[in-house]
A protein has these predicted regions:
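Acidic, glycine/proline-rich low-complexity segments that act as flexible tails and inter-domain linkers
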Residues: 1-5, 11-35, 41-128, 157, ...
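A structural feature that tracks compact, well-ordered secondary-structure segments
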Residues: 12, 23-27, 124-125, 135-158, ...
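Residue-level detector of family-conserved "landmark" positions at structurally sensitive sites
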Residues: 36, 165-166
């Protein structure tokens, strides 16, 4: 089961409220500091560099833990890894995603696959299931239903169980008002029902991960 402290931290980033983020960081002081950093580092893909930099600065203040060493990866491996990770997250919708984003702008398509999934989401330090659950928790609070849909489904595609996504949604909804929380839960319920129909047709367990990336 992914560390709930990481999910709470990710969700708090969507509030843009320093008090909420600080409280989540204080709650995460006992978590793996590398994992905490990875949650903060990947957040720049969704909340932008300014908020991510501010969050990293706040973490240094709250934790007094120095930055971990650079991953020192060879960028030449990011393109292939990005395609692999992105196709895992999007499953059968991967080709359609690439076509749609490429139609918006071909450079954005490359930035998404190579930069987003190859450079960031696929990097070491945090497993893909936890990364996707953290992304979903953040996006639920950030209020972007289309992208939230993709990453709730992507969490299942990466190997999260329904119970694990339930937890991420519950944590995120703790930061939301009644109407927003209801909308998030309704979206997740629709995705869960769709996944259940697919699992039933394939003869899988109702709570089995679609594709477990945790080894």
């Amino acid at each position: 089961m992914p560390d709930a402290r990481l999910l709470r931290l990710a969700a708090s980033l969507g509030t843009r409220d320093e008090g909420a983020i600080r409280a989540a960081m204080e709650g995460a002081l006992g978590a793996d500091p590398v994992a905490v950093e990875e949650v903060l580092l990947q957040s720049h893909l969704f909340v932008g560099f300014p908020d991510a930099l501010n969050a990293l600065g706040l973490w240094r203040e709250v934790s007094s833990i120095p930055a971990s060493p650079s991953a020192g990866e060879d960028p030449r491996g990011w393109s292939e890894r990005g395609r692999t990770v992105c196709s895992t997250v999007y499953g059968s919708n991967y080709g359609k995603l690439r076509d749609n984003v490429g139609a918006l702008h071909p450079d954005v398509d490359d930035w998404m696959a190579t930069g987003g999934y190859g450079r960031v989401i696929g990097r070491p330090g945090l497993d893909l299931v936890t990364r996707e659950l953290c992304v979903a928790a953040l996006l639920a609070v950030w209020n972007v239903p289309r992208q939230l849909h993709s990453h709730l489904r992507g969490s299942l595609n990466a190997g999260a169980t329904v119970a694990e996504v339930d937890e991420a949604v519950d944590i995120a909804c703790g930061y939301l008002g009644e109407d927003r929380a209801r909308a998030v839960r309704e979206l997740w319920d629709a995705i869960r029902r769709s996944a259940k129909r697919m699992e039933d047709s394939n003869g899988a367990s109702p709570d089995a991960p679609v594709h477990d990336t945790r080894g």
